[in-house]
């Protein structure tokens, strides 16, 4: 499988900071969000109409005005799409209506939950101030928690920042409930586990990778102010002794990001800024006796990665695992505008990178696994991946 030069490019008249697909919502999986200097612009991907083409194109739908640069974004799985709704006068509205739930980070270091009907903001929770982060916020993710009768009980937002803190923001009917968890260095990435929203993976700049269950200490969180609480981490890994055995550079072990891999989060992929990457399989050979899904307790032999390697270039943007094939991930060199596809289980599988000729800001996979959205300083591109079939 290789990246193709078959690309669709859409010029932007804003400065982008981040991009993400609405991949968790079945009805909105073709929506792409660009966070930029004045807000969030939503695009819809559709099949290209050119005869013989199998690519996607983008159509701008609307812009949600936040009034500040939007630096990080995450869609809730509660996002939905509907048609032929009636307005207040009983008339049929033929325009599509997107009900969106977006967690975002703005330049003032606030974390926000924005609920919209198309571009109209219905509700906006601004979470910050004295009870929020006291420095730059580096990543954010959102998860929906359902009750026993399959109703949405609350939405949970996780954020990490340069203040060496992970904050869990629970949005309930009674208002936001916050809890802070100290880290040993600045937090650079955070992600809920796909198969269990109670569990989080957190990456720290010093190479620490931590997993914990945020529900284990709820009694300490039942207050309206952020309080640093002691929560038992389920698992801690560290890239420092692993990558320094083959790299002497001081930046070798500085983590770029860490992500779950597999649709159930059965593995971990960590990318260092030097280009070194490491992969852990939490459930090797489906032997669930080696590790408990609920407690994440590992034996000593599991602390070492199952496989590791290095990309063709350093990466400040980290790794983006393929949504369907857990052996593959994409990485990028932001300054030189390079995108590379790597197979973790094929030795020397480094593919020839695509050179875009412009700095890369962010990139992410479409849920179908055949297209990569790439935000550059002046445009957004959809690059088709040759060799992967679409769903």
From Swiss-Prot:
Gene Ontology CC terms: cytosol; nuclear pore; nuclear pore outer ring; nucleus
Biological process per Gene Ontology, one example term: nucleocytoplasmic transport
WD repeats: 137-179, 182-222
Cell location: Cytoplasm; Nucleus
Keywords tagged on the record: Cytoplasm, Nucleus, Repeat, WD repeat
Record InterPro entries: NUP37, WD40/YVTN_repeat-like_dom_sf, WD40_repeat_dom_sf, WD40_rpt
SUPFAM superfamilies named in the record: WD40 repeat-like
Location (main, coarse): cytoplasm
Leader sequence segment: none
Protein name: Uncharacterized WD repeat-containing protein C4F10.18
Native source species: Schizosaccharomyces pombe (strain 972 / ATCC 24843)
